């Protein structure tokens, strides 16, 4: 997916940045290369520094959520384990869906200053994925540590990708337990 991205472009608006995250998720579903999740990390100026798509099933690795892949790429390109290292500009994560418990934890340690998501965790659970222990306090914890969180940007478009994944009968590897 990284090959299909215009790395020289300045992504000026939140909408443009989220459009990229949703498009990455859509391509991942249409190419049947992974789950319906895409993420991108930008410097606040709009410079793209990392992208990721869900590759859990394809690469047999439960950690390869879109956000985790984007964090790995961005930190590698920054030459630091944290995007908040001295001399680094503020970084922002745009992700097609609200992050799961693992990705929220990684967001805390990644060094991002802002997290923006499209579809909600409830939208993802309705598809059948189990997102783990994500609570309102999870978002509050990040906010108290200086990470701004905004949800619902291009939610309808992100939910369209989730519906398409269901139509194509994509695998649900972390299923919501039956009650």
Identify the meaning behind each predicted range.
Residues 37-43:
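Short beta-strand scaffold segments in enzyme catalytic cores
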Residues 56-69:
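A short, polar/charged loop-to-alpha-helix boundary motif
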Residues 30-33:
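Short loop/turn motifs at secondary-structure junctions and domain boundaries
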Residues 100-103:
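Short cysteine clusters
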Residues 84-97:
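Immediate flanking context of iron-sulfur cluster ligation sites
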Residues 1-28, 89, 106, 110-179:
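Zinc-dependent deaminase
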């Amino acid at each position: 997916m990284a090959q299909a991205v215009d790395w020289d472009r300045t992504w000026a608006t939140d909408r443009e940045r989220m459009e990229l995250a949703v498009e990455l998720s859509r391509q991942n579903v249409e190419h049947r290369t992974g789950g319906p999740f895409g993420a991108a990390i930008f410097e606040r100026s709009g410079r793209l520094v990392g992208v990721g798509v869900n590759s859990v099933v394809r690469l047999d690795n439960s950690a390869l959520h879109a956000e985790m892949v984007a964090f790995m790429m961005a930190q590698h390109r920054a030459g630091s384990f944290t995007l908040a290292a001295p001399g680094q500009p503020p970084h922002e994560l745009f992700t097609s869906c609200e992050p799961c418990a693992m990705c929220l934890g990684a967001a805390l340690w990644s060094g991002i200053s802002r997290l923006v998501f499209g579809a909600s965790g409830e939208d993802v659970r309705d598809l059948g994925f189990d997102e783990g222990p994500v609570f309102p306090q999870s978002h509050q914890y990040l906010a108290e540590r200086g990470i701004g969180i905004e949800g619902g940007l291009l939610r309808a478009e992100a939910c369209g990708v989730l519906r398409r994944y269901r139509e194509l009968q994509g695998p649900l590897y972390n299923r919501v337990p039956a009650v």
